[in-house]
């Protein structure tokens, strides 16, 4: 009987036999020999590389979501796990953030270094040029200066947009010319646009024309490899691909429309992103393996995990709005570049098994329709040796079935891969004693020494004589009414001050003599001050209504509104129209202040003087005892922490570091001048958390991230990744690190902890 085996030695003996039969080794990809010219074509069955059909597993790894010294570690682990292709976007707004005349390719924006490493580790690349990327990345990857081009309409048959897109794509192709496969580089696929088919109808006939123009223009660049356009079912001259949690049922309609195109899955959403105020989404590994196996059974030949490694939204790169700094995504490699078990090891085994039977798959056409053994149980057979038996039923009772004179037990929502009557892989099987949710973040420990050497502090209002709230640095704009925030900040800061001088009238007070401020429309978050004294906060989409308390009940005061973005929209049509800041009316009582003459200023003073790079020029207030009572504990306070690094491990392959910000509230962090990102200790209030479901291997039925989450009633994020090369600032003789924090509300920096985790490979 071919019953499910728990004996892994037997499983690997069977796999070895399959390998010998096919004359292949499991790690078969010798794809990028030095200076080898790679010929890439395709037909309806698969991609063909140098004349050989390929079954390909791809992993999304975005180069700017980790530090450049982590790239080799992440890529090596990916290769060892059976990944064939690295999938990455080009992020336009990190390479040209402020103007079309600048180019930035340093640090973790060094795309050529990343591609060199891909080739070094024998990995192909799918380069998704876009230029729209989505990716939960701020503004979908668009540089904000595009908004200033008159009459531009993004992603439309619009001359201004097409001019800018052409210039950027031509530059990218020329800049990366040596990295395309015909020139000996690792890039074997390229993508133009991104998921445009989901929004195309919102652009009408112009959308259709733009989609056609996009691929025609891309092909005119003559890069010598196939172009893809994901979720684009009206274009024949690019390979249309699928994105989603399950894509097996997309294949038949795809081949009906494009019989000469292979079936590629460019985004198997292996988890999901997390918003501030939400609990952590988890996707069961059994469901991922099930979706993979079904896709291959139906004829798919390329699967990309989105994400294979998620990493971190450093700086202000997270999109949304409201997306947290971590982009862990519950990926097989966690935010810190380490295996997320059991997702990593089971995915690796799946790749090894499928690579071993590649020729049996690709040298046979998929069956036109499956064979049904019973309700919910179907078989896809390839030749005489290989079968995929699927139970897509959701009853929790296993089924006993007969196939090819053998008896098998199959679990619900699972696939058995059978070779020569033996089970090579069961997508539902979890080895005994498996630890779930076993990843780096759950194994951090505080460094057992008093590493905070000193704490300094200064209020943003005290950083120059003009004070905060819109005065002081000459970068202010006056207007009768508030101006949309992005026009002021040019997205160089989350923060924008709106200030006006108020003289109250009888209309300002309610019947109890109180003053209430109302802002009818704003995005995303506001802090309210009167004469530099904090009054309260609000965040959209709620109406801002709060009581004001002028100092000494003064009838004249300066009203200061600090507006904040928390990541710019990354998925929408007509993003050229995107606006932030104060967009509605502003009233105190029934006194309308909207046209009261406003002063607007981009950024905090500390940001504008780059306090995180010039901390030695600041007249900091020292807190000798570093006790809570000696701290300012007021909104908009900058803190400087000197942290001892003496005796700490510096081996990037064996240790990872993070900051525990549980004692703080909301703000931003810099370590040695590197922006770690936003922090916010907002609690996850989502009511559906399924820690017990995860521990009990519950995976049956279609996955929905909204009801499969953990860590309710905890902060959405309290642990913040600090790359080791940033912590030691590329100089391992450093004895300390400098941490700069802007705390918007209040907190105790004395209780910030540096955490470490020693990696056991």
Curated annotation (Swiss-Prot):
SUPFAM superfamilies: (Trans)glycosidases, Galactose-binding domain-like
PROSITE patterns: GLYCOSYL_HYDROL_F35
Positions annotated as active site in the UniProt record: 195 (proton donor), 267 (nucleophile)
InterPro entries linked to this entry: BetaGal_gal-bd (IPR048913), Galactose-bd-like_sf (IPR008979), Gly_Hdrlase_35_cat (IPR031330), Glyco_hydro_35_CS (IPR019801), Glycoside_Hdrlase_35 (IPR001944), Glycoside_hydrolase_SF (IPR017853)
UniProt-listed Enzyme Commission number(s): 3.2.1.23
Keyword Signal: yes
Catalysed reactions listed for this entry: Hydrolysis of terminal non-reducing beta-D-galactose residues in beta-D-galactosides
Family of this protein: Belongs to the glycosyl hydrolase 35 family.
Record function comment: Cleaves beta-linked terminal galactosyl residues from gangliosides, glycoproteins, and glycosaminoglycans.
PANTHER family according to UniProt: BETA-GALACTOSIDASE RELATED
Protein name per Swiss-Prot or TrEMBL: Probable beta-galactosidase 2
Gene symbol of the encoding locus: glb2
